[in-house]
A protein has these predicted regions:
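Active-site neighborhood of glycoside hydrolase catalytic domains
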Residues: 1-82, 264
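Carbohydrate-binding surfaces of carbohydrate-active enzymes
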Residues: 13-14, 18, 32, 48, ...
Length: 309
């Protein structure tokens, strides 16, 4: 493609570059990748517009917005630079492996260099949008809450306080259910959790996770591998990261998620699974890390392309 004017740009979709055999792929990865960046940056600009409007009147009040773990469409490493602190909504699927949700917590913690984050939302009882909206068994809400705290959460909050009376969220759990009083198991569990966390606050608040191992996660790499038309339909960037993460977690080895712009000097081991895109200057960062005594581990399908694929 040769573009002479902005109007020459065609959105990469099923009518142009992309096709959908078993998920979105593209014939021209560069243009499809740039569109993902443009889309993420455009929505980030909207957030910054709203943030700046608020900051004009309350400059000393921190501003955040709800992130969503491993959400594929937005580059949260860029977003984190514009947020005063990280907050996110945790809704693990019924029956999902516990390591899966733990990994999302650790990603959120890593977005601000290991600083604590806020668990902005979780359901106290049931979600309204999963395939099977199962009620959490007694004690499950408490376990998920402590998992968040163990991985860096400084706040444990819920959505919603009172069940909606209309639209889809009338099916979504709440601290106060449709019954309208506090005489429910869910309310009693939340009250008990609040009392426990109050007693633990001196220990938990502001706590950090010292780690000597870092795992590199990069949205550009994620987009590029998802869009790749080859060499195999079985390539899955997220799943590859997950397998390394799960191994570290089950060996009780603390780790941090880092982006390609982050400093590596504080780590002994850096793992970069499927580093398909080696961005400008990152090879030198890796060499410097290894020369200083660090160990760098990568995997197959690494080092294929530069920033623009």
């Amino acid at each position: 493609h040769t573009f002479y004017d902005w109007d020459d740009v065609v959105l990469p979709d099923m009518r142009s570059e992309e096709f959908n055999w078993d998920g979105i792929r593209t014939n021209f990865q560069g243009i499809s990748l740039d569109y993902r960046r443009f889309n993420s940056d455009s929505i980030l600009d909207c957030y910054k517009l709203e943030r700046d409007a608020v900051k004009e009147y309350t400059p000393d009040i921190p501003v955040t917005t709800n992130l969503m773990g491993f959400y594929p469409s937005l580059d949260y490493q860029k977003w984190a630079k514009e947020m005063d602190f990280i907050s996110w909504d945790s809704y693990p699927s019924f029956g999902a492996e516990t390591e899966n949700n733990a990994m999302a917590h650790d990603l959120m913690r890593g977005l601000k260099g290991g600083k604590p984050f806020a668990l902005m939302e979780q359901t106290p009882s049931v979600s309204n949008w999963h395939t099977y909206c199962a009620l959490k068994r007694p004690g499950m809400m408490r376990l998920y809450s402590y998992q968040a705290a163990a991985h860096g959460a400084d706040t444990i909050m819920f959505f919603q306080m009172r069940r909606s009376i209309g639209a889809c969220e009338k099916y979504h759990g709440a601290v106060i259910d449709h019954v309208g009083n506090e005489n429910t198991r869910v309310f009693r569990e939340i009250t008990a959790l609040g009392e426990e966390l109050t007693e633990l606050s001196d220990t938990l608040l502001g706590a950090r996770t010292p780690a000597e191992v870092a795992v590199v996660f990069d949205w550009d790499n994620w987009w590029a591998t998802v869009l790749s038309a080859g060499p195999s339909r079985c390539i899955n960037y997220y799943e590859e990261i997950y397998q390394y993460y799960k191994a570290l977690l089950n060996l009780h080895i603390p780790m941090d998620f880092v982006g390609v712009d982050d400093d590596l000097s504080g780590y002994k081991v850096v793992i970069a699974p499927m580093l398909y895109m080696c961005k400008d200057g990152y090879d030198e960062k890796i060499r410097s890390f290894v020369k200083a005594g660090g160990t760098f581990l990568t995997s197959y399908f690494s080092g294929y392309v530069e920033d623009h694929d």
